[in-house]
Amino acid sequence: MRHTWRWFGPVDRVSVQDAAQAGAHGIVSALHHIPTGDVWPVDEIGKRQEEVRAGGLEWEVVESVPVSECIKTQTGPWREHVANWQETLRRLSAAGIRTVCYNFMPVLDWTRTDLRWTARHGAKAMRFDRIDFAAFDIHLLERPAAHEDYDTATREAAERRFREMTEERRLALSRNIGAGLPGSADGYSLPQLREHLRTYDGVSREKLQRHLVEFLAEVAPVAERTGINICAHPDDPPWALLGLPRILSNAEDYAFMLREVDSPANGVTLCTGSLGALAANDLPAMTRQFASRIHFVHLRNVLREEVRTPCSFYEDEHLEGDTDMVAVIAELLQEEQRRRAAGRVDHQIPMRPDHGQEILDDLSRGAQPGYPAIGRLKGLAELRGIERALSHATYGLSAATR
């Protein structure tokens, strides 16, 4: 696999040189300062490339070109935004970039109730607590239909939890849930979040699925002509939140998307952490099912704290948690072998160690939530070790089949 590292630009406290020292081959980045829906300027794309090259690596994957809420709801200037997305693909292709990640999550990107929860050994990790989330939804956000989305036991537990919360914890919970895209300074206040939720009134799961397919029908041909692989990131977590539909949460969702827009450029961002929060998702089987259309990989592990859906979970160490990471990597390596045999130019799949616990000097250094230097370095080293062992000529996968 092609080992990559997410970098949020010059504001990132972890440098490109740090990434190179950690063993990364390339950088994953985006132009977070460009307003969603606008075309990315050629000079800004070139500037980011030069910033990355100054650290000794190349910008190889875009994560993400945001999809505007106008596109998702098909309201306002959504057609203009689709045209701008197409033009951005052309410009990225002209700059030599071949992989573009995006997501179709309405309003909220990844959602956590704690950004620096204390895990074992004193490490800090991100966590989703379903009772805290219900307390936020019912008692802080005061969403009109919130009570209907939770069973009696959850509502009662949420009410107790809310009463026990300090005002400081209530404010922190609102900030954590209302945080914007990683790398973005944008976030939602409670009034802003209520307003954004109202824009999805009447947008059913089926309607949002149709909007995704219609969006892909416009952009996938451009991606195919320009030699770019576009890859949809799964919902995080993979279940409905705040009454909003989720449409990329399991194998059935991805099979529908790939079947409806059957272009080799239209593919999957395999995020084992996002999909792994849902116990029904068999990650090695999903990797095998969608192998030929996996264009980008996020390797991360979560530990589900309950046998139910939705559940509370936290981001565990990369080789711990509920996902069999060795099996997933084995499937990916076998797919790379098939691609080489078929002569595919994209035979090497870009992968990044997704998130990481804050450990050692991370705890005092500070970083974008989920993106500390040492926690990710440790994760990448462990993942690279699995890959190296499975690829060994004498003791690896190929030897086992002889």
UniProtKB/Swiss-Prot annotation:
Group of enzyme by EC: lyase
Keywords of this entry: Iron, Lyase, Manganese, Plasmid
One BP annotation, GO: D-glucuronate catabolic process
Catalytic activity, reaction form: D-mannonate = 2-dehydro-3-deoxy-D-gluconate + H2O
Coiled coil feature spans: none
Cofactor(s) this protein requires: Fe(2+); Mn(2+)
E.C. code: 4.2.1.8
One protein family per Pfam: UxuA
The protein's annotated pathway: Carbohydrate metabolism; pentose and glucuronate interconversion
A molecular-function term among this protein's GO annotations: manganese ion binding
InterPro entries reported for this sequence: Man_deHydtase (IPR004628), Xyl_isomerase-like_sf (IPR036237)
PANTHER family the UniProt entry points to: MANNONATE DEHYDRATASE
NCBIfam families: PRK03906.1 (NF003027), uxuA (TIGR00695)
Its job: Catalyzes the dehydration of D-mannonate.
Similarity annotation: Belongs to the mannonate dehydratase family.
Protein name per UniProt: Mannonate dehydratase
